[in-house]
Amino acid sequence: MKETLKQKIIAELKNRITGDFDLRDEKDAKGNIQIWLKLFNRKDILHVAQVIKDFGGRCVIISAYKKDDHHVLVYHLDIDGILINVEVELFDNTVDSITPILDSANWTEREFKEMFGIKLVGHPNPKRLFLDESIAEGILGEYMPLSQAMNGAATCCMWEKIESERHKNEH
């Protein structure tokens, strides 16, 4: 049954995506199906989101990271237990919001906007979730690589740098 659903999802993705893309699917040792999709036209994320919605799916989370001189987003989407991972490179640091299509993307889009300074086009509620308005968007990426932040080794130092920068901007 999941195999049939996977084939329908893949067919619909191929039908709706307008730009170039790479697509592969795999099944792990426990039988979990994953679809991996790399979009070369960032606008196609809207078509993918519509496919997910049409199949009754949701946005689980969106990962953001820095690659060379630009950001990359990986959308982790779910349709009835089938995980669809969609990679989009942002060479202009801008992406269309999928929240108007998939409300489940709301907070995770706002989080990457705030933490990485990625510009969201068309988000219905782009207010911040965590950082005070006086702190610049994307500031965390300027002071500390994610790998250091994740191990918690330098949290105090990071916040000291952010507070110092904020106080400089106030004067």
Model-predicted segments: where are they?
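Terminal low-complexity/charged segments
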Residues: 1-171
